[in-house]
From Swiss-Prot:
Cellular component GO terms held in the UniProt record: HslUV protease complex
Family as reported in the entry's similarity comment: Belongs to the ClpX chaperone family.
Subunit structure of this chain's protein: Component of the ClpX-ClpP complex. Forms a hexameric ring that, in the presence of ATP, binds to fourteen ClpP subunits assembled into a disk-like structure with a central cavity, resembling the structure of eukaryotic proteasomes.
UniProt binding sites for Zn(2+): 15, 18, 37, 40
Domain spans labelled ClpX-type ZB: 3-56
HAMAP family: ClpX
UniProt-listed SMART domains: AAA, ClpB_D2-small, zf-C4_ClpX
UniProt name for this protein: ATP-dependent Clp protease ATP-binding subunit ClpX
Sample GO molecular function, one term: ATP hydrolysis activity
Gene source species: Ralstonia pickettii (strain 12J)
InterPro entries: AAA+_ATPase, ATP-dep_Clp_protease_ClpX, ATPase_AAA_core, Clp_ATPase_C, Clp_protease_ATP-bd_su_ClpX, ClpX_bact, P-loop_NTPase, Znf_CppX_C4
């Protein structure tokens, strides 16, 4: 029964599920001839959450659809990343195999599949971070970017490596199961190389020490993370996160690695003359794909960490044609973004081919790659975007070579004013 008379004649209402009266619970919600209390609602929600977590664990990915194939992953990367065809292919296969492995966890088998973390080697602005971000968005898994240069050994001033896992948890609302299937991108991994091949009596707290700390995280460990972003202190309960199934992608420019590779392969001599240097710079894209573990060890990475990054993809330096394509082709191309911003003011933006060429050349001159394109376009449009809200009648903004190369002002095209009747 959902209701009956009390001793005072008051009509008492009861939960149809647990039988508690309206005085024993905070809230009683009525339905067609039934009632349910807030405690039973909480219990139902908990059961649903637990079942969803189990189902997600068995299914592997935190996505509803099936795992995309390497071809589908590559096609998605093509929409956002221009060029770097071989790197995209390597990444597509590695990521597909990683999440395929997770989908089959727990199944009894004689063969245990190892995790294949990834090392991306390429110059600044070649698309390393964008590739990792696009992969995480496609797979709908938690993603975090960490800067290796801010990391230090535990106990020293700086970020502890376990802070990376804390940020990953924050990005998925502290759902541990989701975090344990996420992607971590560690940028500037080359900046924590050993300072020399010989052990030093002084502590290398931001070099080899950090590599050793990262090694545990990358190969798989139980990381202790303070709940909800609190600071670590004794007598505190920690969240335990197993990093065994987190995919780690490490990226770096590795400036000078090509010299080490060429020394090993004896294809060319190493010198300090300008001619030799220009030759080396010209051949970097051809030399980097020949990288071997021994080259990375000589560069300053510890052998154990290299062993935990078995998949190596190299990215080429972007040329003028690639940078021009990046400006206009991808889904979220920079030119499309600024066209949308100006369209909100009712103004059309046109960047002529000569303007695109000038932007690409300036980025190459600055040695910033694709990363520098936005700042060049932003600088060219700064005054226009400042004045436009108060500037009536502008129909189109045009950027050409002179706007970029000579720091000239963009051309403003105004709407034709309607002629007043009777005027000459």
């Amino acid at each position: 029964m959902a209701d009956k008379k009390g001793s005072t004649g008051e009509k008492l209402l009861y939960c149809s599920f647990c039988g508690k009266s309206q005085h024993e619970v905070k809230k009683l919600i009525a339905g067609p001839s039934v009632f349910i209390c807030d405690e039973c609602i909480d219990l139902c929600n908990e059961i649903i959450r637990d079942e969803a977590a189990i189902s997600e664990k068995e299914g592997g990915l935190a996505v509803k659809s099936d795992l995309p194939t390497p071809h589908e992953i590559r096609q998605s990367l093509d929409q956002y990343v221009i060029g770097q065809e071989q790197a995209k292919k390597i990444l597509a296969v590695a990521v597909y195999n990683h999440y395929k492995r997770l989908k089959h966890l727990g199944k009894k088998d004689d063969v245990e599949l190892s995790k294949s973390n990834i090392l991306l080697i390429g110059p600044t602005g070649s698309g390393k971070t964008l590739l990792a971000q696009t992969l995480a968005r496609l797979l709908n898994v938690p993603f975090v970017i960490a800067d290796a240069t801010t990391l230090t050994e535990a106990g020293y001033v700086g970020e502890d490596v376990e802070n990376i896992i804390q940020k990953l948890l924050q990005n998925c609302n502290y759902e541990v199961d989701k975090a344990q299937r996420g992607i971590v991108y560690i940028d500037e991994i080359d900046k924590i190389s050993r300072k020399s091949d010989n052990p030093s009596i002084t502590r290398d707290v931001s070099g080899e020490g950090v590599q050793q700390a990262l090694l545990k995280l990358v190969e798989g460990t139980m990381a202790s993370v303070p709940p909800q972003g609190g600071r670590k202190h004794p007598n505190q309960d920690f969240l335990q996160v197993d990093t065994t199934n987190i995919l780690f992608i490490c990226g770096g420019a590795f400036d000078g690695l090509e010299k080490i590779i060429m020394q090993r392969s004896d294809k060319t001599g190493i010198g300090f003359g300008a001619e030799v240097q220009s030759k080396e710079e010209r051949d970097v894209s051809e030399v980097l794909p020949q990288v071997e573990p021994e080259d990375l060890i000589k560069f300053g990475l510890i052998p154990e960490l290299i062993g935990r990054l078995p998949v190596v993809a190299t990215l080429a330096k972007l040329d003028e044609a690639a940078l021009m394509e990046i400006l206009v082709e991808p889904k979220n191309a920079i030119v499309k973004q600024y066209q949308k911003l100006l369209a909100m003011e009712g103004v059309e933006l046109e960047i002529r081919p000569s303007g695109l060429t000038a932007i690409a050349r300036k980025a190459i001159k600055r040695k910033t790659g694709a990363r520098g394109l936005r700042s060049i376009v932003e600088h060219a449009l700064m005054d226009v975007m400042y004045d436009l809200p108060n500037h009536k009648g502008v129909q189109k903004v045009v950027i050409d070579e002179s706007t970029i190369s000579d720091e000239g002002k963009p051309l403003l095209i105004y709407e034709e004013q309607p002629k007043v009747a009777g005027s000459n």
